[in-house]
Structures are given as C-alpha cells and as structure tokens.
Amino acid sequence: MVSKRRAYDVTVRTLRRIHDTLRRTKLLYAFPFGSAFDKVLRVLEEFNKSTKMVNIKKLGIGGGCMFVFGILFGWWGFPAILRSQIKKAIALKPGSEIREMWSNFPLPLDFKVYLFNVTNPDEIKEGKKPKLQEVGPFFYDEYKVKLDLVDREEEDSVEYSLKSTWFFNPKKSNGLTGEEEMVYPHLMILGMVGATLIEKPAAVGIVGKAVDSIFHKPDSIFVRAKAKDILFDGLPVDCTVTDFAGSAVCNLLKTEAKDLVPDGENRYKFSIFGGKNGTIAPQRMKVLRGVKNYKDVGRVLEYDGKPALDIWPEDHCNAFNGTDSTIFPPLFGPDDDIVSFGYEICRSLSAHYKHHSKIKGVNTLHYTADLGDMSTNPMEKCFCPTPDTCLPKNLYDMTKCLGVPIIGSLPHFYDSDGKYLQMVDGLHPNQEEHEIDMDFEPMTATPLLAHKRLQFNMFIQPVPKFKLMKNFPEALLPLFWVEEGILLDDEFVNKVKVVFKAMAVVGFLKWLMVLGGLGMSVAAGVLHYKSRDSGKLDITKVTPKGSSKEDGKADKSWPPSMNISTIQAASVPSSLDRN
C-alpha cells in the first residue's frame, strides 16, 4: 500500500515538472493536447492532495481518539466496571451463583484432629509431670450446609440454620484408622470436677460419689479407649443409677450436657464431636446479604435470636463483629483486617495482614490471627474470668462460653507463656504447623488457603476431696487440637484467574491503545508537515564560470551567452532556411 502511494506521488510530481517546462517554453498550448494535459494534471493534483489530507486527518483523529480511549477505559472505565461487577456478584441474592456456593459449598473442608495420648498416667497420679504423645491427624471431610434460609428484603438479610457433617477419610489419615487404643483423660469426669471447683468447691465430695456410681468406681481419671470412641462413637454414661449423688448429677447432665447421645433407656454416649455430627444446630444465624452495600455482605446481625451475646461483662466483647466466617466483603487491601465472629468460641477474631503471597499462581495477601492477650490489652479484659484472673497471651478461658472449664490456646501452646509449655512434656510448637493463617485474593475476597487452628486444654490440680486427683500436679493439660482448613482446587482457582486474565488483556490493550494512538498522532503531524511542500519544485540557478587554462590546455565551456538555467531556443538548421 505504501509503495503504491509513493509511486502515485512521484508520477504526479513528474508530470508537474513536464507541464512547467512546456509552459515556460510556450510549447504547452502549441499542440492540441496541451490544454487537455493541463486539465488532467490539475485533476490528478487535486485528487492526490485531497486524498492525502483526508487520510492524514483520519490518521490524526483516529490516533487521538485511541489515545484518549486507552487512558479513560484502561485506567478508569474497566476498573470501575470490574469493581461494579464484583460488587454485584458477591451479593447473596436468591438464585445467584455465590448464594448457592455460600449456602451449600460443594467442597468439603479439611478437618484434622490431633489427640494427646498420655504415656505416664500412673506417674501423674503421684504428682509427676504429664508426658504426652501427639497422635494424628485423624482426617475428616467436613461438610457445612446452611438450611431453612429466610430472606428479609427490608433489612437486606438472610437467616439460616447450620448443619455440620464429618466423614472419616482414611486415605489422608496417614495410616490411622480410629481403632488406635489410647490412654486419655475422661473428659466428662474431668469437666465435672473442674466445673464444681469453680462454682461449688464444697460439693466436690458429692461429685466423687456420683463418679463412682455413674462410671462404676473407676480407679483412674485416665481411661483406655479407641480414638474413634473418644472423637465420635462415644464412651458410656450410665444414668440408670438410683443413689442420690448419681441421680442428681445425671439429672444435671441431661439438661446441661449438649453432647450426650442416647444409647438406650437412661444410658448415653459421650464424645467430643458425636453429638454435633449430622445434626442441625439449634441456634440460627442472621447475616446481611450485601445487596444494598457490598461491604456488609456476611456481617452478623443476630445469633440465636439476639443482636449480641450476653455472657461477657462489656458490650464490645458481646458485639457481633465481622462476618460469619464463610464469606467476606471484596475489594480490600493490606490496611484492612479480616474480622469474623466464631460462634463456637463466643467471640470475634481479627486477622492482620503480614505479607504478600502467591497460591497456585494467584497473587494473595497472607493474614494471621491469634487469641489476643487479655492480660495486657484493655479491650480484651472483658474475656477474663475475673478482672484479676486474666490468662497470658493466646490463652482464652472458654468456661462461660461452653459451660465446662475449657482453656483455648494455639496448638502446642504456640506463641504463649513458656511456663505452660514447661508443665508437660511432648509439645513442640512451631509457626508453620500451629499458627492461624489464611491467604486471600483481595479483589474477590476468596480464601485460596486457610488454616483455623485451636487447642483445647483443662487445668489439673491436686483435689484432696476427690481421690482420683488427690495428688495430681498443677498443669494446663492439652487434650486435643483441631485444624479446619481449605485449599481451593484448580476448578475454583481457575474461576478466580478469569478475573485476572481479563485484567491482563485490558492491561495490554490499554498500553497498546495509548502508545499506538500517540504514535498515530505523531505520524499524522509529520505527514501533514511534509505534505505542505509536496507539490513544490525547487530549481537552482547555475551560472557558468569563465574559461580557464590548465597544463596549457583550454577548458571546454558553454558559450557565455548560454544560461543553462533556462531552455534556449534552438538554432534553425540552414537546410530549413533554404526552403
């Protein structure tokens, strides 16, 4: 195309030179074709000039438009459109894809349980330090389904009940089957004694008689049981007893112990998770849908029909801060904390940004969380049992929350007071395995990788009025710890990557349009400048010099009267004059 355009220009300019030469010699109109030649040349020149100018203008206008569009669309338009679409997509509207995934997530959570086997139960009875052996993970596929959803358009909320189900996964349990026999503290006995010591220490003797009746005079607080019985299948609780102490404690257990599973008339099974497995939690949760304001998506409004908890002495500790931990508002950055309410622990937790990370090729933000420090943080004092009995960093007394004297911590007492680590043998805390962490893609608020970890412990101490613990040492005894985690599979990660592929394409196109538009505009300016003189013919006047001699020879030169800058009339041959 360029060569044809250039050939056309050269042709027209050559014809113009011929035309000017003929006109100066007065020969242009001496021939019949002269007038026609003049008209044709004028038409060709006008066409050439108009075509070039139109194309240059189009080039300049097109380049300018491309430049402006690249800036507006690439740096403002597309990001605004993308943010708008994300805000709409995250809303929990009935029938939407995100609503379906939120209410019935198709992937199971990774639920790992680690039990602490007691290797020296007899020595503990004599006051020696407990020696522990971690056994795990017992791996379970955990499915959480939200049921009986009720929408309230006026407040932009949705209310639901939660059902949790665990399925044992032997392939991921590293050879463990659940049949492993362990020496383990009887959690019901230990809990009964611990709760009595807190609420009514004088009644410990009655509890001792009830233990002999209900559990048939055990000789140790430690029992030998299979892991699956401790976790899900349950240990026997015999409430067919008729003595006063046994009957009184059994009546209390029937009303207060939520994890008892009936196993015949007045007989029950007690386990850590068995009472929750496959059942619908009685407490309903109400959260905002994020239709009116995307920043509110998932934010907890009510739990168990209440706008706040009523177990802590201060309002800010009872408040529902953050989401229900299954969805988070999008479009956040490193300056924003990730806050969620954990109904299992009766409080909200905040995760703080640590550093950038990358999961399966997606750029993410790495967050970590802990249980706080009630002993030094004034805002967390209200989580202490009393203002004067606050536990140190990353130890959380959950007695008021659970109704039993459980102390929460990070696994292996990670990042806590070292004195508790010295009370037992067999713990080896490390950050990678025992920290609460998560990796979020911040634009869509997608957690690509997450580990929620919590260890459950109980205090043991000498109890003179209870023979099974009469000579016990003082220690915070680890019982078990759990990890609830997720690593999104490739199918879901690819859905997240679609957003970034679109961003990458637009990022390439915006620079292509900006640089291309700028180049076209510059090219149009240069062509316009050159086109102004494209029809001119520069003629340089040459004046001959006088003759000179060199080496004795005269130089040949044009006649002095001859000016080669103009066309001279030719001499008429003599033969023509004779006619």
PLM feature spans:
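Non-catalytic, peripheral interaction segments enriched in hydrophobic/basic residues
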Residues: 1-44
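Alpha-helical and His/Cys-centered functional microenvironments
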Residues: 572
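Compositionally biased, intrinsically disordered low-complexity regions enriched in proline and serine
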Residues: 9, 20, 30, 38, ...
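A positional/structural detector of protein chain ends, strongest at the extreme C-terminus
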Residues: 575-579
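Extracellular or lumenal secretory-pathway regions
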Residues: 47-363, 370-568
